[in-house]
């Protein structure tokens, strides 16, 4: 437990001098002691500058910090509470409670910097995880123990989609969930807490928040805090769900920290260590022979450009990608998932079965053909198309509308009750549209319904 003194403060970067024979290691947690508002502030060592000086990043606001303050080295990285005591609680990056409900009362703490499971320890499964959302279950099915990314620009519905997934999976799935709010709005964190409380699953969820107003060091580490809690549940042999909103803010916090530490930026101004930082986080989100972590991560796409280095680096780590499109959202079709851009490794006849694979493929083929015909329709109109193409367009428009669905979490905005559609009903519905069974039903009947039976009922009512 060596002590040092603050020698320089530049925003969130703090240099601390220690005796030459007791210099802290990289990632060690240091604590400011003494009077004033900064008492108890935690710093994380990022670099050793030589001469006993270490460069650190503050995990809280550095307002009121000054040179000469005493700093104590804890001798280990930041550690956070793990285990069942964290369930139903809201914590910050350090694992301290921020829900005003008393101490966590944990029996064990884990350090947030841990090695990823070795190749021998990892396990993979082809078991599907039903989400109850038609477009996802059909075109980009999730695997239990897999990694899923929700990609989308600003305001196309990433958080709403994630909330619906939590609502459908966390309630139906009796396991435990960990929610890491990384650099997102405090209001959304608040909404999530009450959503979980009202639906009675709060005692199965641990929540870790490092929101937009926090310093970059805090936002950079909060994903690791949430992951550490999930790892503990996995190592106890449980199946755990990890929700991260938003991975892009994790990257952005890394960019801020990198700039503060004086590193030369790389492509588009991102940190040179972008791929490595992403790998450190993503490689730990994995399933072992003991238990599984199924993760759903929201990924903000800057300026709707999927080739931006941040989303592009994330793509490589995922088993399924759900791409949200602004064009589809502008048509009023929600969830605004692009069925032609979204992918899943599970969409294989050996995994999902031949029928599911053929229906998904058929849907994508019809939509792709419709996309190609749109230019001809815009210039020459529908009358110039062949009968086959007219039928393709008609079915494609029905499929487009049938891919929409009312959400439980959006009931308060839309006024229509949310629908959970089983995979069996989803396949039956789309198979019927492709085969021409519902050619006589107007396309409006397919908009914002659950199963195909509701669409038929809606059409009969309109007659």
Curated annotation (Swiss-Prot):
Q: Which domain of life is it from?
A: Bacteria
Q: Where does ATP bind?
A: 152-159
Q: Which reaction does it catalyse?
A: ATP + H2O + 4 H(+)(in) = ADP + phosphate + 5 H(+)(out)
Q: Which PROSITE patterns match?
A: ATPASE_ALPHA_BETA
Its membrane topology is listed as: Peripheral membrane protein
**Where in the cell?**
Cell inner membrane
SMART domains in the cross-refs: AAA
Pfam families annotated for this entry?
Answer: ATP-synt_ab (PF00006), ATP-synt_ab_N (PF02874), ATP-synt_VA_C (PF22919)
MF annotations from Gene Ontology? ATP binding; ATP hydrolysis activity; proton-transporting ATP synthase activity, rotational mechanism
* Root EC class: translocase
An annotated GO cellular component: plasma membrane
Protein keywords: ATP synthesis, ATP-binding, Cell inner membrane, Cell membrane, CF(1), Hydrogen ion transport, Ion transport, Membrane, Nucleotide-binding, Translocase, Transport
Task: Just give the chief location class.
Answer: membrane
| InterPro entries in the cross-refs | AAA+_ATPase, ATP-synt_VA_C, ATP_synth_F1_bsu, ATPase_a/bsu_AS, ATPase_alpha/beta_chains, ATPase_F1/V1/A1_a/bsu_N, ATPase_F1/V1/A1_a/bsu_N_sf, ATPase_F1/V1/A1_a/bsu_nucl-bd
What HAMAP family does its record include? Answer: ATP_synth_beta_bact (MF_01347)
Q: What does this protein do?
A: Produces ATP from ADP in the presence of a proton gradient across the membrane. The catalytic sites are hosted primarily by the beta subunits.
Subunit comment? F-type ATPases have 2 components, CF(1) - the catalytic core - and CF(0) - the membrane proton channel. CF(1) has five subunits: alpha(3), beta(3), gamma(1), delta(1), epsilon(1). CF(0) has three main subunits: a(1), b(2) and c(9-12). The alpha and beta chains form an alternating ring which encloses part of the gamma chain. CF(1) is attached to CF(0) by a central stalk formed by the gamma and epsilon chains, while a peripheral stalk is formed by the delta and b chains.
State the similarity comment: Belongs to the ATPase alpha/beta chains family.
Q: What is this protein called?
A: ATP synthase subunit beta
